[in-house]
Amino acid sequence: MTASVGNIVLYILFLWIAPVFVGNAICNRLSMRGTIPRSFVMGYLSMWAVFQIITVPLILLKVSFLVDVVVYSMFLIGIIVYGIVKKTYRSMTIPKVEPSAWVGIIVMLATGIYMIVQSFRLQLTNADDTRFVVNAVDTVRTNRMLLTDVNTGKEILSWTGDLFKDVISPWAVFAAYLSKITGISAASMMHTFLPPVLLAVMMCIFWLIAGELFDKHIYRSLFVILLLVMYIYGYFSIYNAETFTIIRLWQGKATMAAVGIPALLYAFLRLYRLLPDDRRWKEKTVYNAEQKGAICMVWLTVFAVALLTSMSYILSTVMIGCFGFVYGIAKKSLRTAVMVWSACLVNIAYLGISTLLH
């Protein structure tokens, strides 16, 4: 299926522009500065989180895919309208950069574009776990969500095998949604059109992480360049994160490695920076609006990565446990540790659903 000019316009609108406005509105609610890179990242994290919250119950109820499309689209329209009414887009800015740092930023952007071009060429070279593509294509074709046996093509009444994992992490259904609203076939969406967007999100997250580590933009750009070079030349094994990112980013577990884990790391780093260092154990922990927003971002990110792969339930839980323990001691606040650990409730709930289905 060849994408028409209209399909490309919808692709740019829904996958490149709309997430920025959605993310900017979310940044406003979480007391975050809504720069374009941060808005782009927060847009996708919030879109994934809400899709996870909406879609899993609808899959369990065996509702048609069209209902999911309508309900989720209403959310997107609602959050964009909220941003327009509240005029949150006025806070959308490009980060101010020192003149001396522009050379590094230009090199960083050139490296990122080169990586996207190379990945664009390589995403069709690997067919492992193509059942994700089959699930997405079948969802669009039959209007059923994960109710087709990928081996036989026949409709099933209950889930079996790998579908147990997909029910609580319906990444293929999200790809099907993108296919539905843009008119681009699900296979083309996953292999060709979605990877460049995900790589752009990954690079923006790297930039945000660099912002938590370095004050000067030249150091931030060098940090991102180093990471991108490691990814570009890291294709020395079929099992490492670099390979999954370059040639298999259409898989949910690859997106978890490239986007999900860095997003969690950024959420934790930002929370750590915002929490005070000079408090005593006996002092009552009180959070301001920005700190509450940072805690909400941790929860939001945990919901978001839950959509990508069932592996996220283990990976994010380990990260939550470790960071919560460190924060509780370093910040001398048991409440902070509990607030971080409580994000595990998301994973416990979805794993409980999967267990009951078995």
Which residues fall in each region the model found?
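Membrane-interfacial, low-structure loops and terminal tails that flank and connect transmembrane helices
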Residues: 30-34, 88-100, 273-293, 297
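Transmembrane-helix signature of membrane-embedded glycosylation machinery that interfaces
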Residues: 26, 30, 57, 206-215, ...
